[in-house]
Amino acid sequence: MRNIDFNKYQSALIIGNGFDLSLGLSTSYMDFVNSDEFQILLNMQNQLTIYLKVNAELQNWIDIENELKLYSKNEDNAKFKTEYEALCKQLVVYINNIDYSSINKNSKAYEVLTNLSSTKNNIILDFNYTASTRLILKQCGLSDEDIDNRLIKVHGEASNNDIIFGVEDNAGIKKEHVFLRKAYNIKYKALNFSELYDRIKSVAIFGHSLGETDHTYFNKLFQESCMYNKWKIQCKLPPKTKRFCPLVLK
């Protein structure tokens, strides 16, 4: 992870998968589970993907990261690591096959990012694996250098084959399944946004669920907002889902 001078930024945009969905891209985990890339694993009798497919069909929705925790706790699969690694590889293939020509330029996500591109005091924390943010910023006339100075791909990019996919470090998984933890990934470098949070005056969140899997990134952000009323943060959450912000925004 390159060094970034946070001193010049006054605001931050946090982007999650809802951003790509707003653009009209098929980036939900259900899209992946129903894809040809996932079907290849099913045809190979990959037990992990069979488990995920069954649960997705039962619920008509799936949070793969949460299901990985449950699978670790409840299943005994000697091939778990191998099958998990195969899942990660196919996820990269799936994302790299996304057709960006279908991006909805009339979407709210596109509007937000294009408006943001015209100012230089904003930094973007992108939790997606896709190339959508980089592509739109290029369409807005930003150079590769400008984009690299303003865009942090927190979990890596599929185009570079360096995605960080797994569970949070404090997840209750079996000790032999440590490979599931994001910090276990050799490409993972813990990002300390404390300096950024100390300097920025506003935070916008688009399409990020603020879930437990990214708890460490947002802990200081929300705790200080509550204690010092530093920022006004609004978030709309789906019912019956566990999210981080209700734990601190009371």
Predicted regions located by residue number:
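Conserved catalytic-core helix/loop/strand module for nucleotide-ribose chemistry
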Residues: 1-13, 17-202, 208-250
